[in-house]
A protein has these predicted regions:
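Transmembrane beta-barrel domains of Gram-negative outer membranes and organellar outer membranes
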Residues: 1-249
């Protein structure tokens, strides 16, 4: 099999696919996000448990993904504490394809590059106040370059087709990110990431986050990660810590 390359935990997907005939589970064991107060002083907290991306290798350079989000909870806190609400349930089902144009089998020496494309669609499951109520989708274009034997840079641009808050139409949101990854030892690595989202309908403006984390790979098919994203702009979540697990079979 090829080198173990999970997409998590950063927001930047990589261009590499899972080997044909193999399955990879990438899970958020726990994921928490805390928003900044909006114009009305409302704060939103989100709790995710067991959100899992199932990646299935189809051919040498193609895979299918199914993002399952069974246990999500949202707490909305208003200025009046008595008005605090809780909503809980499954989120949307995301179905994704990934195609590697090149680099799957040649990303070994410094200077090597890889390129892929990742189209996806979000399908509402239940109307419970947690997930979206409309079909949405988009496409990612991930790129990676190997800087040295221990470091690589991953870049991604994404176009999201999002349902308008008002009316029946859709608009395009633009997500871009870059993640610098460094191998500390044969089992431990880390990353630093900058991500932006513009074209969103939030009156506070665009979203900018900085993320970092620590990754532990006890063997060539398992990864445990812990980290957090930190919001820079007013529209960004204030903090987003997480703990995750990836396993390849």
């Amino acid at each position: 099999m090829r080198e173990f390359e999970p997409d998590r935990p950063d927001l930047t997907n990589n261009p590499f696919t899972v080997d044909a005939g193999h399955v990879q589970f990438e899970s958020d064991l726990f994921n928490y996000s805390l928003s900044r107060p909006d114009q009305d002083g409302t704060v939103t907290e989100k709790f995710l448990f067991g959100s899992t991306n199932v990646r299935v290798g189809i051919t040498n350079n193609t895979e299918l993904q199914f993002l399952l989000q069974p246990i999500n909870a949202v707490r909305t806190r208003f200025k009046n504490p008595a008005m605090t609400t809780w909503d809980a349930g499954p989120d949307v089902l995301e179905i994704t394809g990934k195609y590697n144009f090149y680099g799957n089998d040649t990303f070994e020496k410094p200077g090597s590059t890889a390129l892929g494309v990742i189209p996806f669609i979000d399908i509402p499951t239940v109307h419970n106040g947690v997930g979206e109520d409309h079909v949405q989708g988009g496409v990612d274009v991930p790129f990676a370059i190997k800087l040295s034997d221990k470091a690589e840079l991953e870049l991604m641009t994404e176009y999201d087709f999002i349902k308008n808050n008002q009316g029946s139409g859709y608009h395009v949101e633009y997500f871009n990110s870059g993640s610098f990854e460094y191998e500390i030892t044969s089992k431990f690595s880390t990353y630093v990431e900058v991500a932006t989202l513009f074209g969103n309908e939030d009156p506070s403006g665009g979203i900018v986050t900085i993320g970092t984390g620590l990754l532990y790979q006890p063997n060539g098919n398992t990864q445990i990660d812990v980290g957090s994203n930190f919001g820079v702009t007013r529209a960004s979540d204030r903090i987003n810590p997480f703990v995750g697990l990836t396993k390849r079979f």
